[in-house]
């Protein structure tokens, strides 16, 4: 029996230190709720988890971007709803003015024309005033530019967490000039061109086919209505796409969060079981260390 080195006590002390260290790690994981609190806990798992976290946050921001895109489209579409209503009223007035058999050109047609002029001015007003976060939406800033594609401006929405996951939207000029109601210089053009509506020029001849006649001007209004309808349909399609995009982003984010949780989050029941085991082993080690420290004293029995 040796008394200078208590090997049993040293071995027991090592076990006690190991059990205490394991218990501390168990408590850290239980208190944080995370299985990986530092790279040393699981280096590969930490790297994968951080990549997933980046993707999750990217998906969340992409969903917000899509929501903002829907808000922009709703702003533009709401303005075009009013433009549609104005054009329907203009068409109604043109049809009314076409009843030249009962209209007086000097008074009745001029009154109708005054209202038409006011309405077309408001179409321009809507086009110039409709904005979203400082961006004018309906004045042609973001229209398709086939003449100079290099100068094309698009409304770009980042709808994914990674590069090249964007959609571009164009909105045509919805001003009165572009809708075929009037030209910038106010001139009367050919039937296929943009026209100024001027019902005071309607002739009494029902067979009139001139560019300033009833048929020509009514066709201009109908074309304007069709242009607005087409633009609203395109915006509606983009809005529907963005709504589906949001649903997909939500599902992807949910699945990725669940996967990241399985890597990084702690299994509370399992970890509590491990903590209980290590705590019991620590207490047992303390008791055995006390016993090991008593062994050298037994040498005194040999000296009696």
From Swiss-Prot:
- Where is it predominantly found? secreted
A cellular component term, taken from the record's GO annotations: extracellular region
A Pfam family matched in the record:
Flagellin_C
Q: Is Secreted among the key words of this record?
A: yes
Q: Please list the GO terms describing molecular function.
A: structural molecule activity
**Induction cue:** Under positive control of SigD. Repressed by CsrA; repression is greater in the 1A96 than 168 genetic background and higher in minimal than rich medium.
Subcellular localization is given as: Secreted; Bacterial flagellum; Secreted, Cell wall
Annotated disulfide bonds? none
Q: Which domain of life is it from?
A: Bacteria
Q: Could you confirm whether the keyword Transferase appears in this record?
A: no
Keywords from the UniProt entry: Bacterial flagellum, Cell wall, Secreted
On assembly, the entry states:
Interacts with FliW in a 1:1 complex. Forms a 3-way complex of Hag, FliS and FliW, in which Flis and FliW do not directly interact.
Q: Which PANTHER family match?
A: FLAGELLIN
- Role of this protein: Flagellin is the subunit which polymerizes to form the filaments of bacterial flagella. Assembly into flagella requires FliW. Acts as a homeostatic autoinhibitory regulator to control its own cytoplasmic levels. Partner switching by flagellin between FliW and CsrA provides a flagellar assembly checkpoint to tightly control the timing of flagellin synthesis. Flagellin binds to assembly factor FliW, freeing translation regulator CsrA to repress translation of the flagellin mRNA.
Name the family the entry cites.
Belongs to the bacterial flagellin family.
Protein name, per record: Flagellin
């Amino acid at each position: 029996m040796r008394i200078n080195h208590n090997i049993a006590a040293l071995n027991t002390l090592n076990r006690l230190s190991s059990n205490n260290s394991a218990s501390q790690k168990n408590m850290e994981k239980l208190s944080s709720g995370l299985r990986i609190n530092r790279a040393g806990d699981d280096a590969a798992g930490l790297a994968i988890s951080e990549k997933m976290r980046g993707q999750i946050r990217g998906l969340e921001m992409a969903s917000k971007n899509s929501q903002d895109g829907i808000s922009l489209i709703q702003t533009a579409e709401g303005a075009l709803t009013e433009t549609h209503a104005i054009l329907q009223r203009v068409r109604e007035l043109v049809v009314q003015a076409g009843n030249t058999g009962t209209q007086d050109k000097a008074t009745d047609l001029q009154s109708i024309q005054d209202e038409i002029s006011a309405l077309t001015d408001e179409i321009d007003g809507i086009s110039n005033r409709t904005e979203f976060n400082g961006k004018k939406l309906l004045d042609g800033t973001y229209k398709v530019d086939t003449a100079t594609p290099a100068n094309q401006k698009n409304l770009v929405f980042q709808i994914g967490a990674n590069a090249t996951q964007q959609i571009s939207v164009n909105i045509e000029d919805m001003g009165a000039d572009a809708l075929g109601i009037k030209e910038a210089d106010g001139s009367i053009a050919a039937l296929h061109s943009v026209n100024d509506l001027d019902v005071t020029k309607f002739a009494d001849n029902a067979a009139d086919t001139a560019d300033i006649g009833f048929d020509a001007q009514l066709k201009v209004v109908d074309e304007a209505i069709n242009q607005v309808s087409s633009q609203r349909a395109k915006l509606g399609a983009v809005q529907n796409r963005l709504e589906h995009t949001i649903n997909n982003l939500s599902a992807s984010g949910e699945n990725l969060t669940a996967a990241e949780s399985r890597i990084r989050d702690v299994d509370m029941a399992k970890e509590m079981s491990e903590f209980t085991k290590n705590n019991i082993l620590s207490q047992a080690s303390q008791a055995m260390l006390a016993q090991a420290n008593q062994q050298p004293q037994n040498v005194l029995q040999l000296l009696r």
